[in-house]
């Protein structure tokens, strides 16, 4: 699992009538806006909504596998990417949030706050999640 797969998503933007259609290629999701200046904002919102819906449905969050310089590249936060990776590890290992809470010796509500995609979380806390899931976080240059 590579953080870069969750950091940058490729989007295609087409103009139809007065709307800009934004498609996140690897996720097969799309949205639209009338405001050209809000394209990146709507693209990020679409990626975030997609990830949250996958968490709700208890499915893995797809990484970006389509990398093309011809398309608009949407840069997500490192916090978002790490949380997607943790959620996917939990999915692979069938680890429930309550089990992660037990491993971390904290409440389930605290785990939900840590893994909330809309809240920022300290890198040390996220690294601890990787450790207790037996997939230590490694950073290479």
Map each language-model feature to its residues.
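DNA major-groove recognition helix of helix-turn-helix/homeodomain DNA-binding modules
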Residues: 124-140
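Broad gene-expression machinery/nucleic-acid interaction feature
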Residues: 8-10, 19, 69, 73, ...
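DNA-contacting interfaces and partner/effector-binding or oligomerization modules
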Residues: 1-58
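Alpha-helix boundary/interfacial micro-motifs
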Residues: 34-35, 42-43, 75-76, 135, ...
């Amino acid at each position: 699992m590579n953080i870069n797969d969750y950091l940058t998503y490729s989007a295609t933007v087409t103009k139809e009538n007065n709307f800009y259609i934004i498609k996140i290629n690897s996720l097969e999701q799309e949205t639209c806006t009338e405001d050209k200046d809000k394209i990146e904002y709507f693209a990020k919102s679409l990626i975030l909504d997609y990830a949250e819906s996958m968490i709700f449905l208890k499915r893995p969050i797809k990484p970006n596998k389509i990398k093309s310089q011809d398309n608009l590249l949407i840069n997500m936060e490192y916090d978002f990417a790490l949380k997607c990776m943790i959620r996917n590890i939990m999915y692979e290992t069938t680890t429930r949030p309550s089990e992660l809470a037990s491993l971390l010796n904290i409440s389930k509500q605290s785990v939900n706050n840590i893994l909330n995609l809309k809240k920022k979380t300290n890198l040390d806390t996220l690294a601890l999640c990787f450790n207790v899931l037996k997939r230590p976080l490694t950073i290479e240059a």
